[in-house]
Amino acid sequence: MPIRYPNGQPYSRSPKQGQAKKPLPADTYSGRGMTLEQDIDEANLYYLSQQRAVVHKKPTPVQIVKVDYPKRSAAVIREAYFKQASTTDYNGVYRGAYIDFEAKETKNKTSFPLKNIHPHQVDHMREVSKHGGICFVLIRFFQSAEVFLLDAKHLIDYYDNQDVRKSIKKTEIERLGHQVKTGLHPPIDYLRTLDAVYFNGDAKERT
């Protein structure tokens, strides 16, 4: 059964969990060669195994186009399309708080294009923030493999002022955001950054 993205391109299944990975270059421990989402998925599995957090990627909705019924009691999907996700990529619970975030990667060296964020995602971030959830975006600059956590309020401010600038300078992300430690286990340790930004370091209570 062919499954396609909203633009009509065929869906290619990513390697199954457990398959051997290509060795990383000797000069880095970060997930070069892996997508940002793959690194986050691996980090989330690590956090779950260590009983630190429960965070999952939200499933992408699928629109079924063609269904055959070879048997009265069975249906076979012949054609389907991925629909555009209505919210952000990930959500879960950490230290008793609801967290919700988007993951974006850019090949630009000096800025992050705001066109990578969709209006419905910004609307969702507004609502999560308004109701007290921890909401942010993880941005990876592909060329340098640097990952930054930017709180939703800063992203929303820039998004609402696109008549002034269509992107966020990397220097602004460095100033307003927080660089996330990368390594082996986990490949992207964003919980460490959450501790520093939202939980006053090792404090029990949120700041």
Curated annotation (Swiss-Prot):
Q: Which molecular function terms from Gene Ontology are attached? A: endonuclease activity; magnesium ion binding; nucleic acid binding
Instruction: Relay the cofactor remark from the entry.
Output: Binds 1 Mg(2+) ion per subunit.
Compartmental location: Cytoplasm
Q: Where is the signal peptide?
A: none
Q: Which residues bind Mg(2+)?
A: T87, D89, E102, Q121
Which InterPro entries does UniProt cross-reference here? Answer: Resolv_RecU, Restrct_endonuc-II-like, tRNA_endonuc-like_dom_sf
The cofactor named in the record is: Mg(2+)
**Cellular component, GO annotation:** cytoplasm
* Annotated EC: 3.1.21.10
Instruction: Please name the GO terms of the biological process aspect recorded for this protein, alphabetically.
Output: chromosome segregation; DNA recombination; DNA repair
Ranges for the region named Disordered are 1-30
Looking up CDD domains in the UniProt record yields: RecU-like
Any one Pfam family match given in the protein's UniProt record, by short name: RecU
The protein's UniProt keywords, in alphabetical order, are: Cytoplasm, DNA damage, DNA recombination, DNA repair, Endonuclease, Hydrolase, Magnesium, Metal-binding, Nuclease
Which family is this protein grouped under? Belongs to the RecU family.
Entry protein name: Holliday junction resolvase RecU
Which gene name belongs to this protein?
Answer: recU
